[in-house]
Amino acid sequence: MDGIKYAVFTEKSLRLLGKNQYTFNVESGFTKTEIKHWVELFFGVKVVAVNSHRLPGKGRRMGPILGHTMHYRRMIITLQPGYSIPLLDREKN
């Protein structure tokens, strides 16, 4: 699916891995329900909650022209106890 861009590994997201919460950057047009359904289907896990916030784009200057990068949405997905996403668990250790 093209909706999820990549997993995020910041200090906060690594701390949230201990609480069984995973952080992803997704396309800004997707809703919480769509991402929840896709994560449950693709990873075979049970999602308890989905929190999201929209990150602003950054300004970029190329000579006299001022441009910007696109904004995106970050989703924090909480899984039911006993479930995990195996590819991201290696980052916990």
Curated annotation (Swiss-Prot):
Keyword Plastid among record annotations: yes
A single BP term in Gene Ontology: translation
Keyword Glycoprotein set for record: no
Localization of this protein: Plastid, Chloroplast
One Pfam family in the UniProt entry: Ribosomal_L23
Protein origin, superkingdom: Eukaryota
Keywords, ordered alphabetically: Chloroplast, Plastid, Ribonucleoprotein, Ribosomal protein, RNA-binding, rRNA-binding
Summary of the function given for this chain in its UniProt record: Binds to 23S rRNA.
Family in the record: Belongs to the universal ribosomal protein uL23 family.
Assembly with partners or alone: Part of the 50S ribosomal subunit.
UniProt-recorded name of the protein: Large ribosomal subunit protein uL23cz/uL23cy
Organism the protein comes from: Oryza sativa subsp. japonica (Rice)
